[in-house]
Each structure stands twice: as structure tokens, then as C-alpha cells.
């Protein structure tokens, strides 16, 4: 549902943020 979709998006954003931080 929406919650799982939001979690997936947050995970993607977190990964991109980690790459940017490195």
C-alpha cells in the first residue's frame, strides 16, 4: 500500500543521500 511505497521511496532517498555524503 501507500506505507510500503513511502518506505521504498525513503530507502531510495537515503541511499542517494549516503552516496552524496561520501
UniProtKB/Swiss-Prot annotation:
PTM sites of type Leucine amide: 22
Keyword Transmembrane helix in annotation: no
Location of this chain's protein in the cell: Secreted
Annotated tissue distribution: Expressed by the skin glands.
Keywords carried by this UniProt record: Amidation, Amphibian defense peptide, Antimicrobial, Secreted
BP term (GO), one: defense response
Protein family: Belongs to the gastrin/cholecystokinin family. Magainin subfamily.
Its job: Antimicrobial peptide.
Protein name: Peptide PGLa-BM1
Organism annotation: Xenopus boumbaensis (Mawa clawed frog)
Amino acid at each position: 500500500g501507500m506505507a510500503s511505497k513511502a518506505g521504498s521511496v525513503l530507502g531510495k532517498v537515503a541511499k542517494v543521500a549516503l552516496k552524496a555524503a561520501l
